[in-house]
Amino acid sequence: MRRALRAWGRAQGGTAVSATPGTLAVPPAQPPQLLYAGEVDGAAVVLFHDRGVRVVRYAEPRAGSGAPALDFARTDGADVTTGAALVVSRDGDRARFLMAPWIARTTTRDLLSPNSPARALEVNADGVTAAVPRPSPGGRCDSWPVLQLRSSERIVENHAFLLTDLGDLAPVHLTFTPGPAARAGARQPREATSTPALLAWARTACSLTALRGSGVRAVNNWNFAEQRLPESGTPAQWLCTRADTWQGPGRVMVQFLPPSASLTGPGTVVGDERDTARCSRFGQHVLAGTRWRAPSGHWYVLAAGSRAVSRIEATGAVRESAAGTALAVRAPRDAPVELTARLKEGGSLTAVR
């Protein structure tokens, strides 16, 4: 522990130092709190909490010539979910986590197997889990392991939630906002443990690869619209996947989910914006569009908006408008088309690009 504190105060040459975006890799301003000290996977590991601001991990190999590592991550404002676990060790394609004392049940599941039950995960007396698979950092996305945790009833009654490892010290909280219901008001994000939530994440989990190592705190899947496709009338879903970071700015990816014979048929990312309030409580209106080819071979421009959209307009190579939250118009595959929407309470909206 002394070497860990010494390295934090002044990292020596040969110590690998990393910090998630927005995290200061500087010495502590006051004595830190010790969270864990022990040997894990052949390394001596120490975890400190910098009084609600940062988590710092120091690790040095017990044998061999590997260099010590010092990792910094922001945790200011962490709550029951975002402060529930920390990465203690990563070894190849597996990781171990330190569980918070308020976690009563620890399980794992695969987002790409939404119908499979969660499996029990062993936790030792020090609060460290057995090694669990990590999402693959590249290549094929044929599974997406997550932690499914349940907090003690002394904290929040019957509260289960999902966390996933995106490469930072603090795993990322996954949530879900269901689609609009008739005569219902705006809905809030909820835990992604329901059947609709798991089915939505089964088709969008692989898009999380784009968020690795970017200091993400939480990701919400908002099912903001359903659209009946032209010619067949079968329903397609529109989701806004919003990532909030510890340092503040958010990123959104709008995904179009046409009907699929597979529960894990991936959606198509049709819009990607950074440093935006869209799809948050500060940006509750969204419009998106894409090109889609019908089984007949005809190409269409499709557009959909959230519940406050009253009319969608297409201009450019085609000119068309439709009342409500969805539009479909025949158009050549590469025809330039601009999409705008009007809101029920006034004002306009441009599409996520």
Give residue ranges: language-model regions.
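Short, surface-exposed polybasic-aromatic patches that bind anionic ligands, especially phosphate groups
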Residues: M1-R353
